[in-house]
């Protein structure tokens, strides 16, 4: 079918690469490109004997547009799958524009020096991508990603209008460390230490970090504390789903995680402001990332399950209706299949599926689009096929 360039070689990228190699009818060739080529080579050497997909590797600095353009022109992929850092989204989009190559990512752009993420920077590329005749698919992970597909599916098949969405992200896994993050520590800690927010009646309502707490009983996991966070898909879903009055995002955290995080905040280790140390400028949060366990190393020691989904409330044929779409994923099953814990798995699988939707022409329109702006049905079918089966509940317990 075609070739895909995957930029990044962390935990999520590793899962996406494994899944591309399982899907060699679509992904005839992939190039793994990262700042550290040796990591790419190690993964290629492990996977090449197991797949018909031809794997190539390259070194690239994703902050350098000229380097990216040269590499894309050399390999000539049909689509670029950006699994690098959110700070690098715009340089990679610039390179895709210059080479007229389709673009897919899993997280929206975030300036390196400001812990604030929103879509305005990427949405500003809409006209340029339209004129170039190429597609940019934004947010093809789980959240954002599957949550948007779930929302589009609910809108298409279950509702005339959706008034309330609660996105619930529960990780019931235990890795045995006193403190570690399940994905990039720098991104994770920036996200959870920022102020929370939700959208109500078309306006953002801001909260203090971890101010709003709820308790929910998750199927396959049990009762967990969850906290309201700001999350990027709220912004696009509020625009793209008909009838929205309120949309919120909750994530579960254990008390040990929160206690450690508070201590680190109190001593300044979560700061993104540079400081001078022995004549060198360092960012405390980046230093903390260097001493914490690598999320990619958590797979063999993480047990338990995740449960991530969306509770919808709205109207169908003039009557009130509730509907819950969710996925349950087992950390150890993920590790057996691709050597990863479920957090990376639940992001890496949809990343591959999004690239497949663009590569096969199943989703085809020039411009910059969020995932809920496409037909959800082929993506929903692919989730069941490629390892993230979804479940439905037509009488869910609601979040107050």
What are these regions (language model features)?
Residues 4-11:
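Conserved N-terminal Rossmann-fold NAD(P)-binding element of oxidoreductases
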Residues 13-17:
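N-terminal Rossmann-fold NAD(P) dinucleotide-binding loop
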Residues 29-31:
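Short beta-strand element of Class I
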Residues 35-39:
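Helix N-cap at the beta1-alpha1 junction of Rossmann-like dinucleotide-binding domains, i.e.
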Residues 49-64:
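Rossmann-fold cofactor-recognition segment
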Residues 61-77, 84, 88:
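Conserved Rossmann-fold cofactor-binding substructure of NAD(P)-dependent oxidoreductases
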Residues 106-134:
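Rossmann-fold NAD(P)-binding glycine/threonine-rich loop
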Residues 156-400:
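C-terminal catalytic/substrate-binding lobe primarily of soluble NAD(P)-dependent oxidoreductases
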């Amino acid at each position: 079918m075609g070739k895909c360039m995957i930029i990044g070689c962390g935990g999520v990228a590793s899962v996406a690469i494994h899944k591309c190699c399982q899907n060699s009818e679509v992904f005839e060739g992939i190039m793994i490109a990262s700042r550290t080529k040796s990591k790419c080579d190690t993964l290629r050497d492990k996977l090449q004997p197991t797949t018909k997909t031809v794997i190539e590797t390259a070194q690239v600095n994703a902050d350098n547009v000229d380097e990216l353009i040269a590499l894309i022109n050399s390999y000539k992929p049909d689509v670029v799958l950006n699994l690098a850092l959110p700070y690098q989204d715009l340089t990679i989009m610039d390179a895709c524009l210059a080479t007229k190559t389709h673009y897919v990512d899993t997280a929206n752009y975030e300036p390196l020096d400001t812990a604030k993420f929103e879509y305005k920077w990427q949405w500003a590329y809409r006209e340029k991508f339209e004129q170039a005749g190429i597609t940019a698919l934004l947010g093809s992970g789980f959240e954002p990603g599957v949550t948007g597909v779930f929302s589009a599916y609910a809108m298409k098949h279950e509702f005339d209008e959706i008034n309330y969405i609660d996105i619930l992200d529960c990780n019931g896994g235990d890795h045995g460390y006193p403190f570690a993050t399940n994905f990039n520590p720098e991104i994770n800690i920036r996200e959870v230490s920022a102020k929370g927010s939700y959208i109500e009646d078309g306006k953002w309502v801001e909260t203090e970090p971890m101010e709003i707490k709820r308790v929910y009983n998750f199927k396959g996991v049990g009762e967990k504390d969850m906290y309201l966070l700001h999350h990027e898909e709220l912004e696009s879903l509020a625009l793209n789903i008909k009838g929205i009055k309120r949309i919120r995002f909750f994530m579960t955290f254990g008390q040990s995680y929160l206690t450690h995080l508070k201590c680190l905040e109190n001593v300044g280790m979560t700061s993104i402001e540079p400081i001078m140390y022995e004549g060198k400028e360092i960012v405390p949060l980046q230093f903390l990332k260097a001493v914490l366990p690598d999320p990619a190393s958590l797979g063999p020691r993480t047990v338990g399950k995740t449960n991530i989904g969306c509770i919808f409330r709205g109207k169908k044929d003039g009557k009130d209706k509730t509907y819950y779409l969710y996925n349950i994923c087992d950390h150890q099953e993920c590790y057996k299949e691709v050597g990863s814990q479920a957090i990376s798995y639940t992001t890496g699988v949809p990343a591959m599926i999004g690239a497949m939707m663009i590569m096969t022409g199943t989703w085809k329109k020039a411009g910059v689009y969020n995932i809920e702006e496409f037909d959800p049905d082929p993506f929903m079918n692919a989730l069941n096929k490629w390892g993230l089966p979804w479940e439905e509940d037509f009488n869910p317990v609601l979040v107050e």
